[in-house]
Amino acid sequence: MGQKVNPTGFRLGIIRDWTSRWYDDSPVIAEKLKQDHVIRNYVQARLKRERAGIAKIVIERTTKHIKINIFAARPGAVVGRKGEEINNLSQELSRITGREVKIDVIEVIKPEIEAQLIGENIAYQLENRVSFRRAMKQAIQQAMRAGAEGIRIRCAGRLGGVEIARSEQYKEGKIPLHTLRANVDYASVTAHTIAGAIGIKVWVYKGEVLVQRIDAIEEDELKKIKDRRGEQRSRGRDSRNRRRRKPRQTT
């Protein structure tokens, strides 16, 4: 199960949250979801030229406006000089959506362990005719040095411009895909090369989450079990004592 399913969707509601954080039970919910998709594609295409390194885009909606949180490795490229870029982007999105748009930019502290940024970096190198093996190995080394506990990268397509398509992957560390508390970041990126499209998949294991919470729950359960056993033992002792104290009937 864990080997086949998308690791992000597999962990939604457990250790991962949705990137569209709003609720609507009206019939226009499909239009709003489509609008979110358009916003993400527009922002990524708009900032791709600036090499801002967009790791994630989170959209929140209220009755009055739309709030967009952009997680970027280079927030200065998103904001621009004196905030010109972010103001222009906000105005363009307001024209597209027909509502007021507010944009917040959050800096990504460690871009070397963000799966989306790793995939985009490899795709950029492949499109500029860098060896796929060199790009993959370099990304793995950088991620492990930055603190990742495990990483796996798979490239599929006409690697090196050969006639027959194939897939190759490199891995270092561990990737526990079946463990739901394991924080596994996943991304899928396509590189458009002269030989054709090359698919890039990246898995990054950043460690376990909810460990303290799980330990606390287990300790609480153990305490309850011990208390229950103690009560049962005390009841057993009381019943034995009552039987011993019961006077014998004499004829």
Curated annotation (Swiss-Prot):
Q: Where is the KH type-2 domain?
A: 39-109
Q: What is this protein called?
A: Small ribosomal subunit protein uS3
| Classification via PROSITE patterns | KH_TYPE_2, RIBOSOMAL_S3
Residues of the signal sequence? Answer: none
Q: Out of the domains of life, which is the source?
A: Bacteria
Region span, Disordered: 222-251
Composition bias of kind Basic and acidic residues appears in 222-239
Q: Which GO terms describe its biological process?
A: translation
- Indicate whether rRNA-binding appears among the record's keywords: yes
Entry-linked NCBIfam families = rpsC_bact
Q: Report a single Gene Ontology molecular function.
A: structural constituent of ribosome
* Quaternary structure, from the entry: Part of the 30S ribosomal subunit. Forms a tight complex with proteins S10 and S14.
Matching InterPro entries, A to Z? Answer: KH_dom (IPR004087), KH_dom-like_a/b (IPR015946), KH_dom_type_2 (IPR004044), KH_sf_prok-type (IPR009019), Ribosomal_S3_C_sf (IPR036419), Ribosomal_uS3_bac-typ (IPR005704), Ribosomal_uS3_C (IPR001351), Ribosomal_uS3_CS (IPR018280)
An example Gene Ontology CC term for this record: cytosolic small ribosomal subunit
Q: Which UniProt keywords apply?
A: Ribonucleoprotein, Ribosomal protein, RNA-binding, rRNA-binding
- State what this protein does: Binds the lower part of the 30S subunit head. Binds mRNA in the 70S ribosome, positioning it for translation.
